[in-house]
Amino acid sequence: MITKPDKNKTRQKRHIRVRNKISGTAERPRLNVFRSNKNIYAQVIDDVAGVTLVSASTLDSEVAGDNKTDQAKGVGELIAKRAIEKKITNVVFDRGGYLYHGRVQALAEAAREAGLKF
């Protein structure tokens, strides 16, 4: 019997491979994205200290949108605004093993337009 590979397990393996190569520092922290079926979460993380500096998600009341892609754009704008308030402008983008398409791409482009550099 042929079994289909679990999409989330392959994503996690891909994420581990990427995480072995990139790391966030205090000068250039990591912008991490996690996508669930209903929500999308973004965090700016300093991996050296092991601290989350800024976070935003669709669970925040400031994020509104008709569909998930619009909500992801709102999260991107919000994470960029909060990061710039803490004087963080340069980040390393960590797509979390997801394809750079759809909600992940919308979040990244909105964060870039709002002032984050990556």
UniProtKB/Swiss-Prot annotation:
| Signal peptide feature range | none
Q: Which SUPFAM superfamilies does UniProt cross-reference here?
A: Translational machinery components
Q: What is this protein called?
A: Large ribosomal subunit protein uL18
| Disulphide linkage map | none
**Which family does the record assign?**
Belongs to the universal ribosomal protein uL18 family.
For this record, an example GO cellular component is:
cytosolic large ribosomal subunit
Q: Keyword RNA-binding, does the record have it?
A: yes
Keywords of the record, alphabetical order, are: Ribonucleoprotein, Ribosomal protein, RNA-binding, rRNA-binding
Assembly and oligomerization: Part of the 50S ribosomal subunit; part of the 5S rRNA/L5/L18/L25 subcomplex. Contacts the 5S and 23S rRNAs.
The protein's job, in short, is: This is one of the proteins that bind and probably mediate the attachment of the 5S RNA into the large ribosomal subunit, where it forms part of the central protuberance.
- A Pfam match: Ribosomal_L18p
The Gene Ontology biological process annotation of the record reads: translation
Q: Which HAMAP family match?
A: Ribosomal_uL18_B
GO function terms (MF aspect): 5S rRNA binding; structural constituent of ribosome
